[in-house]
Amino acid sequence: RWREKNKDAFFRREGVKLTYMPVITEAVAKALAAYPQVNVSVDGYNILFKKHINVGIAVSLNDGNLIVPVVHDADHLNLNGLAVAIDSLALKARDNKLMPEDIDGGTFTITNFGTFKSLFGTPIINQPQVAILGVGYIEKKPAVIETPEGDTIAIRHKMYLSLSYDHRVVDGMLGGNFLHFIADYLENWQG
């Protein structure tokens, strides 16, 4: 509903389409700030903690391949800044105009198989990163809504998230808490 209400005005103001990816990227950036143990890479026997939160966004190319341009310092961008950055990188990727700095330095990756109407999948970690978030297709589903007056059934937009992570660094508790942070942020996001 939020996207439908705001997409035309957003396009007029920012010159880019309003998608869910900037909101998801914002949630991931906040989760990485809250759980810096996930914003690391593995170098041999060493774990390298990253100072910057640089989120890679998998972009499908016309030839069927994928490339992962990087939104540098994603935690310093607001929703508008994220939308413009993601749109710009995706266009550059599809026009084969990415520069080396556009694909370098990622500390975490998001892949959106929902673009292809897949509900969920198992993303492969973009090494040397230690985790990747997979985003599924958003569809309407019946859901139980808990209220003080009792439970009721309503139609809600649902999206599956999947997190793959390197168990040498991220255990189940950390991975579960990280994913819960993202899901909770998205479920309670006000726009």
Tell what function each PLM region has.
Residues 1-191:
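C-terminal catalytic/motor cores of large multi-domain enzyme assemblies
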